[in-house]
Structures are given as structure tokens and as C-alpha cells.
Design a protein with these regions (language model features):
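Short acidic, flexible loop segments centered on an aromatic residue
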Residues: 53-72, 216-223
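Asparagine-centered strand-capping/turn motif at beta-strand->loop junctions
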Residues: 41-54, 59
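Contiguous beta-strand segments within globular domains
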Residues: 40-42, 185-212, 242-244
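Short, surface-exposed loop/turn motifs with a glycine/proline- and acidic-biased composition
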Residues: 236-259
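Intrinsically disordered, low-complexity Pro/Gly/Ser/Thr-rich segments with frequent PxxP/GP/PP motifs
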Residues: 66-114, 225, 231-244
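Bacterial Sec-dependent N-terminal signal peptides
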Residues: 1-14
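Edge beta-strands of extracellular beta-sandwich domains
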Residues: 267-275
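Short, aromatic- and glycine-rich surface loops/edge beta-strands on solvent-exposed regions
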Residues: 217, 253-266
Length: 275
């Protein structure tokens, strides 16, 4: 217990310096190269302390590692790393990060990076949030793309892993929107890590009917046109109904949509979504 307290107190009192600042001030030499992926520990950083004193180095969450090949993706660091490096010594670390240019190709093995820069605003916020609240790789990647490439928050799929719902709530609050009631699925593309080609939308809805009558449900698109009819008109009793929406949206344009629920041709409820 005594040793644990000493280590914690030392970490709390030690002042760490940004890896970028140390490199600019000629205190360290660094070389960055891809390990051949775009998620997790995917960039290797070789560091040499070229001073005569120990250095306390900080690789910050929110730092964007700049891929020197513009056709390949930059990497957004999502995990803080603080470490000491003695005088005239070398070390190697692996940066934990995710791609932040969804339309680019993934970095190839040994591709060179520069130390890049610290992001600001929403990208910095999501990096620091995921540093404190990590979830599964697919969810973290989707969350980064929401802010780096303006992807629909509904692209973040619910999973059984603890923390995903809290992440969706935090993102909705950050964007000042409601938590999407639906999820959007995208096609795979071997030429890029994210295709941006939506094909399916799923999610539960609930509606209430004050009395019996003839029920009909449609989806209207951005130009108010009918995009889909859920069922033929059916006679139903009054009450509360739950319905699992499952829409094929492959050819639908991006924009705002409404599910309209009618009873005896009278509009009873509208449910919004966007793709």
C-alpha cells in the first residue's frame, strides 16, 4: 500500500511536457510509422532523449497524427500516455488511436507520420471523452467519424457493452439533439474504411390511438413525397402500439424524413429521422 501511494503521489506532482513541444525544442528525436491498421495501437513512435536530463513526456488524447500520404488516413489519439525517458535513452511506444478521415484509405504498414497537432472543439472533446470512457473499437470509430466527417449519430450502433448508451447520450447532448431512436447501417467497401452508403434503418417506435379505426403508416421524404408504405390500411382497436421499424433505404437521398401515422385518414403522430 505504501509503494502504491508513493507512485500515485509522484504521478500527481510530476509535470509532463507535450511530445510535440519537446520535439520542437530539439529535446527529443521522434519517428512515427504505421503498424498497418487504423484502430487501436496502430502507430509506432520511436523516441530518443537527446538531452542530458530525464524528460517527462506526454502523448495527449486529442492529438492528430498527420499521415504524410494525403490519400491515407490521419489518426486521432484517444488514449493519454505519460512516461519518463532518461537522458540519452530511447524508447518505443504505440499510439492508441482511430482514423479521422473516413473517405481515405487505411494507412499501410510502415507509412510515415508526423507528430501532427492538437485538435480543438468537438474532436478534442470526443477524444478526451473516450480516453476516460473507452468502449468497443467499432463504437469508438463511429463516434470519431460523427465529429471528424459529420456522420449521422445514428451510425453508432447499440451493443451490449456497458457505456455505449452513455456515449450516445453524451454525443446527443454535445450536438444539442435528441438521442436517435433508430440505427443506420452502411455497406462495406474494400477501397475505403467507411463507404457512406446507407442501406438499412432499424429502430422501435411507439404510438397510441384514441379509438378503433383504419390505420395507415407512411414515410415521407425531404420533398414530402411518399417513400414507403408500411402496411395496407388495417382496422385496429384503440390503444398503445409498439412497432419495430425496418426500412430498406439504399436508394434514398440524404435528408429529413417523417413517419406519419394516420387513423381514419387523420394524422395522429409524426416521428422524425434523418439519413
Amino acid at each position: 500500500m505504501f509503494f502504491a501511494i508513493v507512485l500515485i503521489n509522484q504521478a500527481q506532482t510530476t509535470s509532463f511536457t507535450s511530445i510535440e513541444e519537446l520535439a520542437k525544442n530539439k529535446k527529443i528525436d521522434i519517428e512515427l510509422k504505421s503498424l498497418g491498421g487504423y484502430q487501436g495501437e496502430c502507430v509506432q513512435i520511436d523516441i530518443e532523449n537527446i538531452t542530458n536530463e530525464a524528460l517527462h513526456i506526454w502523448l495527449e488524447s486529442g492529438r492528430r497524427l498527420d499521415n504524410l500520404n494525403d490519400a491515407q488516413q490521419d489518426i486521432l489519439v484517444l488514449k493519454d500516455q505519460r512516461f519518463n525517458l532518461n537522458a540519452k535513452k530511447t524508447t518505443t511506444i504505440k499510439a492508441f488511436g482511430f482514423c479521422c478521415q473516413s473517405s481515405n484509405r487505411g494507412p499501410r504498414a510502415d507509412q510515415k507520420f508526423s507528430i501532427g497537432w492538437m485538435e480543438k472543439d468537438n474532436l478534442l472533446w470526443i477524444a478526451q471523452y473516450l480516453n476516460e470512457h473507452p468502449v468497443d473499437f467499432a463504437t469508438m470509430q463511429s463516434a470519431v467519424w460523427v465529429f471528424s466527417n459529420d456522420k449521422n449519430p445514428a451510425s453508432i450502433l447499440q451493443s451490449k457493452e456497458e457505456g455505449v448508451l452513455e456515449l450516445k447520450k453524451a454525443i446527443a447532448k454535445r450536438l444539442n439533439i435528441e438521442i436517435p431512436w433508430y440505427e443506420i447501417y452502411y455497406e462495406k467497401d474494400t477501397n475505403m474504411v467507411f463507404s457512406d452508403k446507407h442501406y438499412n434503418l432499424k429502430g422501435p417506435i411507439q404510438y397510441s390511438l384514441p379509438n378503433r379505426g383504419w390505420l395507415s403508416m407512411v414515410v415521407r421524404g425531404p420533398q414530402k413525397q411518399v417513400m414507403h408504405k408500411f402496411t395496407n390500411t388495417a382496422f385496429v382497436e384503440g390503444g398503445v402500439y409498439n412497432y419495430d421499424v425496418n426500412l430498406s433505404i439504399k436508394e434514398w437521398p440524404k435528408g429529413a424524413y417523417k413517419i406519419e401515422i394516420y387513423l381514419d385518414d387523420i394524422l395522429k403522430k409524426q416521428i422524425n429521422f434523418s439519413i
